[in-house]
Curated annotation (Swiss-Prot):
Changing residue 159 to T: In strain: 129/SvJ. The chain crosses the membrane at residues 8-23. Residues 24-538 are lumenal. It comes from the Eukaryota. Pathway: Protein modification; protein glycosylation. This is Beta-1,4-mannosyl-glycoprotein 4-beta-N-acetylglucosaminyltransferase. It holds the Pfam family Glyco_transf_17. Glycans are attached at residues 245, 263, 401. It is a single-pass type II membrane protein.
């Protein structure tokens, strides 16, 4: 009798374990692409995977009598930092809070036939019926026209519309996508279409855009910072920029970015900049440079997020090095769509000294997640996000269980489709010199410790040949400024201003090389010209 009870008890235990395993397996399957027919069985099941709207931090409500937020002519709907008196503007820049605005831009339009189309990615929003060509609505890339018949995407979509106009609806509602855009609503860029995202079948436009926070540590990469502001200025809602009066090596340095922020250099974007000031150097950072490197990102994240107001848990947080610039289209997708997993990375085009030395492959940088995950899993520590260790964090299982999301890291772009740019050591020779002497004491060998490596003529020779400080030479593939994703658009539009980043300033002139070829001797080239060309090629 006892044996029978034990057997019955064991059978119930095994059945329970099988049921739990099956449920977990089914939950995992929900993040793997499967037939649309199965997905369409339960719209409520799909919607349960999207974010809730509870704030991750307490929302700041304005106190009675507070002054209105300042606004600028360029961005009339975006708040500047809290107004300060002129005498305290520079003193308290690193103490003011930043109120995240709501993005009211009309990214999507609804056609008369009921379709929902992404304006910048759509050529034709509605098929005209015979004899009524006047109703044909077209939106070219970058168009900002808004007619009275176009309604903003600010209302609740039906389940059928949120599933991308599938089934029979596709027969009479159609968005014709421009090159580089995909999906039923033409809002999925190429860098997502050809990515390893496992949930492409679940992508749906959001009712309300997320806000995007981009956090950066700055040393002296001011040209690249200017490029970042122009590339992402209309899709990022807050640039959190950390400035310090110490270099990564622990030496004093002037607050150049703070000066540029207050003297009008970045006036066009100042209303979107949250200034973070690190006024100390971490203990032990001089002996172990990685302590300083990690602490910079930790302080940037914690101080910056603590001063952001009106945050929502589904807002996007992206932390970059100053020489890493994500492409606009990928960031805009994260802002406007539901259904992608986290954390996410970017496949970036790699360059050295300038965009003219294109390195093979891509740099895959894990740099983003939602604010909810940043707080719950990473503990508001940006360096943990960068290290791909979400599965070792003690709270990541609790986060999965609470949100119902399986954490699956993915990358925007691919080795063949760049989703950004990583331009390493992209300075003038003087800028490279400053980077050498400012570098942390942890990435050995520390080339700034060698006097010959700091010589400006030696640095110019490295830029000319594409060589490295250890004397090695690499065979880089040819790069042409006309190729796709050669450099951010703002650089190409201001070619003369940034010529030193787009063309090799120390490349041997073509006239000299051609003249040398014409004066070749019986051995193929004269000794003098051979010496010059060998130096150029070496």
């Amino acid at each position: 009798m006892k044996m029978r009870r034990y057997k019955l008890f064991l059978m119930f235990c095994m059945a329970g374990l099988c049921l739990i395993s099956f449920l977990h397996f089914f939950k995992t399957l929900s993040y793997v692409t499967f037939p649309r027919e199965l997905a369409s069985l339960s719209p409520n099941l799909i919607s349960s995977f999207f974010w809730n709207n509870a704030p991750v931090t307490p929302q700041a409500s304005p106190e009675p009598g507070d002054p209105d937020l300042l606004r600028t002519p360029l961005y009339s709907h975006s708040p500047l930092l809290q107004p300060l008196s002129p005498s305290k503007a520079t003193e308290e820049l690193h103490r003011v809070d930043f109120v995240l605005p709501e993005d009211t831009t009309e990214y999507f339009v609804r056609t008369k036939a009921g379709g929902v189309c992404f304006k910048p990615g759509t050529r034709m929003l509605e098929k005209p019926s015979p004899g009524r060509t006047e109703e044909k609505t077209e939106v070219s890339e970058g168009s900002s026209a808004r007619g009275p018949a176009r309604r903003p995407m600010r209302h609740v979509l039906s389940s059928r519309e949120r599933l991308g106009s599938r089934g029979t609806r596709r027969k009479w509602v159609e968005c014709v996508c421009l090159p580089g855009w995909h999906g039923p609503s033409c809002g999925v860029p190429t860098v997502v279409q050809y990515s390893n995202l496992p949930t492409k079948e679940r992508l749906v436009p959001r009712e309300v855009p997320r806000r995007v926070i981009n956090a950066i540590n700055i040393n002296h990469e001011f040209d690249l910072l200017d490029v970042r502001f122009h590339e992402l200025g209309d899709v990022v809602d807050a640039f959190v920029v950390c400035d310090s009066n110490f270099t990564a090596y622990g030496e004093p340095r002037p607050l150049k970015f703070r000066e540029m922020l207050t003297n009008g250099t970045f006036e066009y974007i100042r209303h979107k900049v949250l200034y973070v000031f690190l006024d100390h150097f971490p203990p032990g950072g001089r002996q172990d440079g990685w302590i300083a490197d990690d602490y910079l990102r930790t302080f940037l994240t914690q101080d910056g997020v603590s001063r952001l107001r009106n945050l929502r848990p589904d807002d996007v947080f992206i932390i970059d090095d100053a020489d890493e610039i994500p492409a606009r289209d990928g960031v805009l997708f994260l802002k406007l769509y539901d259904g992608w997993t986290e954390p996410f990375a970017f496949h970036m085009r790699k360059s050295l000294y300038g965009f003219f030395w294109k390195q093979p492959g891509t740099l895959e940088v894990v740099s983003g997640c939602t604010m909810d995950m940043l707080q719950a899993v990473y503990g508001l520590d940006g360096i943990r996000l960068r290290r791909r260790q979400y599965y070792t964090m003690p709270n990541f299982r609790q986060y999965e269980n609470r949100t119902g999301h399986i954490l699956v890291q993915w990358s925007l772009g691919s080795p063949l489709h760049f989703a950004g740019w990583h331009c390493s050591w992209c300075f003038t020779p003087e800028g490279i010199y400053f980077k050498l002497v400012s570098a942390q004491n942890g990435d050995f060998p520390r080339w700034g410790d060698y006097e010959d490596k700091r010589d400006l003529n030696y640095i110019r020779s490295l830029i000319r040949t594409g060589g490295w400080f250890d004397g090695t030479q690499q065979e880089y593939p040819p790069a042409d400024p006309s190729e796709h994703m050669y450099a951010p658009k703002y650089l190409l539009k201001n070619y003369d201003q940034f010529r030193y980043l787009l063309e090799n300033p120390y490349r041997e002139p073509k006239s000299t090389v051609e003249g040398g070829r014409q004066n070749q001797g019986s051995d193929g080239r004269s000794s003098a010209v051979r010496g010059k060309l060998d130096t150029a090629e070496g």
